[in-house]
């Protein structure tokens, strides 16, 4: 059990963890291992590095700084967030489950949209990005989940007791380990239908009749968590006030997931604000 759980170990999440820990609160940082920052070859516009620094080095140094202070950092993909009977947050990961009094979402903007013809055309007409949000509309119907990782399995689990037929489509990738659902590993050519989704067509010419398609590529992004627990979003970003608080008490967001200027300096500032706000929330709780 922790005071604060932070999902995401980029500049925003790590900055938040430093302020939470310095306030003598227990904090756990979870991250999937995928970082947009690590892909940056050189960052030469951040204070204190006259010769620049690679994104990979800055990412690793940030985690090292947090761990040196006593922050617990775990490389575990967060899959699901919910509130328990004690009004605390449960975060389920690929390895287990953790509990905290406050939650900070700093995942970046990770939503992956496969390059499949028809996805955008049928958004809101059978193509969805949230099983918990929209699964109810597909009671006793046939649906497909597009994805090949643990997040796809998590979305499938949210659907299995609602829908009549469930198929995981990996779009040419190997099936995820431990998958108990019907799987098709073929490359997808197109999502087709009239006014709504009617089928998924594969590159070999065969097709699968479905009423809905749930896109769950990659790992869960901040907006994915947000929608499942009632946090206000705008597109793929989370809406916050000036103190990085969302509309759900005890949940804060910072960094790229809030939109706006996508820079390290902004992420670090918002992380500090979110960390302090989480501490103040716990004091007043």
Report each predicted region and the residues it spans.
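A Rossmann-like FAD-binding core segment of flavoenzymes
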Residues: 37, 66-85, 90-92, 98, ...
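Small-residue (primarily alanine) positions within well-ordered alpha-helices
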Residues: 16-17, 267, 274-275
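FAD-site-proximal beta/loop scaffold in flavoenzymes
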Residues: 115, 121-137, 217-262, 270-276, ...
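FAD-binding core/adjacent interface of flavoenzyme oxidoreductases
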Residues: 1-5, 72-140, 214, 238-246
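Glycine/Thr-rich phosphate-binding loops of Rossmann-like dinucleotide-binding domains
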Residues: 38, 113-114, 154, 210, ...
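Glycine-rich nucleotide phosphate-binding loop and flanking beta-alpha elements
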Residues: 13, 111, 152, 208, ...
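Short loop/helix-cap segments at secondary-structure boundaries that form the rim of catalytic
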Residues: 38-40, 115-120, 136-138, 174-181
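Beta1-alpha1 glycine-rich phosphate/pyrophosphate-binding loop at the start
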Residues: 2-57, 141-175
């Amino acid at each position: 059990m922790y005071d604060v759980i932070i999902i995401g170990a980029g500049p925003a999440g790590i900055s938040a963890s430093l302020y939470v820990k310095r306030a003598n609160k227990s904090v756990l940082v979870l991250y999937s291992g995928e970082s947009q920052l690590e892909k940056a070859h050189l960052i030469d516009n951040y204070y204190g590095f006259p010769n620049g620094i690679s994104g990979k080095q800055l990412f690793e140094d940030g985690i090292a700084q947090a761990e040196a202070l006593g922050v617990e950092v775990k490389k575990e993909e967060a899959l699901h967030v919910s509130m328990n009977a004690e009004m605390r947050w449960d975060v389920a990961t690929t390895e287990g489950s953790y509990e905290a009094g406050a939650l900070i979402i700093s995942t970046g903007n990770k939503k992956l949209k496969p390059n499949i013809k028809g996805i955008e055309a049928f958004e809101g007409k059978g193509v969805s990005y949230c099983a918990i949000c929209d699964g109810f509309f597909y009671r006793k119907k046939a649906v497909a989940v597009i994805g090949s990782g643990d997040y796809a399995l998590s979305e499938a689990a949210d659907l299995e007791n609602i829908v009549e037929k469930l198929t995981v489509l990996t779009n040419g990738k190997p099936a995820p380990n431990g998958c108990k659902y019907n799987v098709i590993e073929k490359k997808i050519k197109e999502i087709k239908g009239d006014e709504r989704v009617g089928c998924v067509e594969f590159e070999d010419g065969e097709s699968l009749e479905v009423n809905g398609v749930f896109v769950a590529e990659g790992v869960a992004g901040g907006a994915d968590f947000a929608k499942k627990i009632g946090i206000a979003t705008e597109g793929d970003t989370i809406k916050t006030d000036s103190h990085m608080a969302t509309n759900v008490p005890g949940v804060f967001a910072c960094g790229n997931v809030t939109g706006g200027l996508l820079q390290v300096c902004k992420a670090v500032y918002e992380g500090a604000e979110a960390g302090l706000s989480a501490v103040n929330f716990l004091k007043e709780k």
